[in-house]
Amino acid sequence: MKVAGVFLLLSLALLCFFSGAFSQGGQDKRGWITRSEGRFPGKGVLRHRLFQINCGEFRDPKVFCTRESDPLCGSDGQTYGNKCAFCKALEKSSGKINLKHRGKC
């Protein structure tokens, strides 16, 4: 049973690694914003965090943001109330803001 669990975890790790989940950051054509943080301190050691937000639904200027609270911290040190507010600020900044982490700054 332990061997099967180890094999499953190793398979999932390899799948994530080779599927492109560890991108360098930026915005792709589907509207997904990726922000990766971390360093590669040595061979075989990987410390990496990946944040993704889908801003595709907020690109329309006719869409207004609600007041729901789900704070996001931007790379500019600003706390945005929710995903919509962050995406609107990202659009206004021409992509210069990145997602630092979820929660208040």
Swiss-Prot record:
Query: Kazal-like domain spans which residues?
Result: 49-105
Asked if Kinase is a keyword of the record, the answer is no
Expression triggers: Release of soluble SPINK6 is down-regulated by TNF-alpha. IFN-gamma and retinoic acid. Expression is reduced after mechanical and metabolic injury to the skin barrier.
Keywords assigned by UniProt, alphabetized: Disulfide bond, Protease inhibitor, Pyrrolidone carboxylic acid, Secreted, Serine protease inhibitor, Signal
Where does the UniProt annotation locate this protein?
Secreted
Q: Name one Pfam family in it.
A: Kazal_1
Q: Which cysteines are joined by disulfide bonds?
A: 55-87, 65-84, 73-105
- Which CDD domains does the UniProt entry name for this protein? KAZAL_FS
GO MF: serine-type endopeptidase inhibitor activity
Its job: Serine protease inhibitor selective for kallikreins. Efficiently inhibits KLK5 and human KLK2, KLK4, KLK5, KLK6, KLK7, KLK12, KLK13 and KLK14. Doesn't inhibit human KLK1 and KLK8.
Q: What is this protein called?
A: Serine protease inhibitor Kazal-type 6
Query: Which organism's genome codes for this protein?
Result: Mus musculus
